[in-house]
Amino acid sequence: LRPMRFALFLFSFFFLACSQGNADSKNLNAINFQPDLNKVPVEGCPAILNHNVRVLDSKDVINLCDHKDKVVLAVNVASRCGFTYQYEALQSLFETYQGKDFVILGFPSRDFMFQEYSDESQVKEFCNSKYGVTFPMFATSSVRGKKANSFFQNLALITGKSPDWNFTKYLISKDGEVLKPFSKNIEPDSQEIISAIESLL
């Protein structure tokens, strides 16, 4: 019986280890994220937007509070992804609602199989020439895990979910409430997203 018990022990050990590994990978360490407690509050700006970010292919740094009093759709993007075509719908969405206190914020990232250019000038050129992107785009950065930029760390902290791929979308109300993330599979011009945006305008 001893060999049988030992075999059962090994099976249980490896099963639990694999299960824990899968759980950890799905969790993406979101619970370990910490809000930026050192940030000076900006009057009238929701805390979720109070982050300094560098503009794409530029030395200019802005605070996302520049977009306070707007409904915000924050998206992690990439130029060489199977979902890159969603840029077209994102730009159309921006053009439709930008006059109604709505903005899209794009955050290029190489987190997922390095599907973004390493050179920000290439990212900018691609977005402009291929899709005519005019919504704000920011510096290439990490959007998941402990190396994520502070904005996406806080999105993960609030929602309990980091991006699991490119083109994950976070909708934020004018008062700073973050709605549940929309996955890459939900198109920007889907009725689900459009209805959610219109309910906040």
Where do the protein language model's features map onto the residues?
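Amphipathic alpha-helical repeat scaffolds
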Residues: N76-R80
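N-terminal "domain-start" segment that seeds a small globular fold
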Residues: K26-C65, Y85
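Surface-exposed acidic, glycine-flexible loop patches that form ligand/cofactor-binding
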Residues: N63-C65, E95-T96, T159-P163
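Loop/turn elements at helix/coil->beta-strand transitions in domains of secreted/extracellular proteins
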Residues: K68-V72, Q98-V103, Y131-P136, N166-F167, ...
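Structural microenvironment flanking redox-active thiols in thiol-disulfide oxidoreductases
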Residues: F83-N149
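Thiol-/selenol-based redox modules, centered on thioredoxin-like
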Residues: S150-Q153, L157-L201
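C-terminal motif of bacterial Sec signal peptides marking the signal peptidase cleavage site
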Residues: L16-A17
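Sec-dependent signal peptide recognition
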Residues: M4-L10
